[in-house]
């Protein structure tokens, strides 16, 4: 599941405009299914797949909550600069 977040910041005293775009996805499940017996075992689920809509919090593959899946954030920052007008 991917989410996209766009943040635009603009400073009044500056001539720089910064735009940031983040893609969030949830990859392999890290839930320890053997924690109650003192061991360590994961289920092998490689990627979170929402059961139901995109906003579902349960994985269709392993049945775990989304928080058990490792979160990856890819952020892209774009800065645009326009020099001050020399005629002012």
UniProtKB/Swiss-Prot annotation:
<dbReference type="InterPro" id="IPR006456">
    <property type="entry name" value="ZF_HD_homeobox_Cys/His_dimer"/>
</dbReference>
<keyword id="KW-0963">Cytoplasm</keyword>
<keyword id="KW-0479">Metal-binding</keyword>
<dbReference type="GO" id="GO:0005737">
    <property type="term" value="C:cytoplasm"/>
</dbReference>
<comment type="subunit">
    <text>Homo- and heterodimers. Interacts with ZHD3, ZHD5, ZHD6, ZHD7, ZHD8, ZHD9, ZHD10 and ZHD13.</text>
</comment>
<protein>
    <recommendedName>
        <fullName>Mini zinc finger protein 3</fullName>
    </recommendedName>
</protein>
<dbReference type="GO" id="GO:0005634">
    <property type="term" value="C:nucleus"/>
</dbReference>
<keyword id="KW-0863">Zinc-finger</keyword>
<dbReference type="GO" id="GO:0008270">
    <property type="term" value="F:zinc ion binding"/>
</dbReference>
<keyword id="KW-0862">Zinc</keyword>
<keyword id="KW-0805">Transcription regulation</keyword>
<dbReference type="Pfam" id="PF04770">
    <property type="entry name" value="ZF-HD_dimer"/>
</dbReference>
<comment type="function">
    <text>Inhibits zinc finger homeodomain (ZHD) transcription factors by interacting with them to prevent both their nuclear localization and their DNA-binding properties. Involved in integrating signals from multiple hormones by regulating the expression of specific genes. Promotes the formation of ectopic shoot meristems on leaf margins.</text>
</comment>
<dbReference type="GO" id="GO:0048509">
    <property type="term" value="P:regulation of meristem development"/>
</dbReference>
<dbReference type="GO" id="GO:0042803">
    <property type="term" value="F:protein homodimerization activity"/>
</dbReference>
<keyword id="KW-0804">Transcription</keyword>
<keyword id="KW-0217">Developmental protein</keyword>
<feature type="zinc finger region" description="ZF-HD dimerization-type; degenerate">
    <location>
        <begin position="26"/>
        <end position="72"/>
    </location>
</feature>
């Amino acid at each position: 599941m991917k989410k996209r977040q766009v943040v635009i910041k603009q400073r009044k005293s500056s001539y720089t405009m910064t735009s940031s775009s983040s893609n969030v996805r949830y990859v392999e499940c890290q839930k320890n299914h053997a924690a109650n017996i003192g061991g360590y075992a994961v289920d092998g689920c490689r990627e979170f797949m929402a059961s139901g809509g995109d906003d579902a919090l349960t994985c269709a593959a392993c049945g775990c909550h989304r928080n058990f899946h490792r979160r990856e954030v890819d952020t892209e920052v774009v800065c645009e600069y326009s020099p001050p007008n020399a005629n002012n």
